[in-house]
């Protein structure tokens, strides 16, 4: 990150198409490597599915990196960081989403593409573990975050929130094995 314009070794400017192609290649490579782990949501998928997921990861990594920056900060380009599955990155959030979908699928819960938010009846909610409470409180902040993003027109605030959700879910996933529960 030397803050100079992004150029190829030959001195040419880097095109968005070439940047996305490299991000897709790295995303696919990482997805394929992770699919070897039996615990991975991508384990057992065929080549076509792995390619599609790798493509989505690569493109979303670049988009997330762009949207996550506050407008007042310098733009520092680091493709390795962008496609990483750790830290404040799009792939980290996508991986959390894949984990959530995998849990729901294993539990036999079908989630429609679009979810309506009906008014829920008030009921006591017992959250016995700190990780459960933290995740619930983080999720409850969503309407306020969306209103704040709409008011300020700063998508970086939504990215920060999604990162917090993914991190809270990661702790919850590690500390509260819901599918192993007898309840």
Summary of predicted features, one role per range:
Residues 1-183:
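Non-catalytic interaction-recognition regions
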